[in-house]
């Protein structure tokens, strides 16, 4: 998994590239947590346009970052989902708590 991050005002924008599955979930989780620790923001946008595959472990990574941001009073936004990933999100009900653009 490749991660590119940039701070845009009060928001951290992170683009993920690769597969977000059980093989990459721990590494991705650790990298995102380090970013959220080092860059004190309340709001995070995850650009998933470069994610070619996601399974339930990837969904868990996103839900965990939602929890961290919620405890800070912040928001998580996702963007750039492929049709397959959008379907996973709709079926899981994640759009009830995570914003999408």
Segments (PLM) and residue ranges:
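Conserved catalytic submotifs in the C-terminal HATPase_c
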Residues: 8-9, 49, 101
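STAS-typified acidic loop motif
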Residues: 4-30
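Amphipathic alpha-helical interaction surfaces in cytosolic regulatory modules
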Residues: 22-98
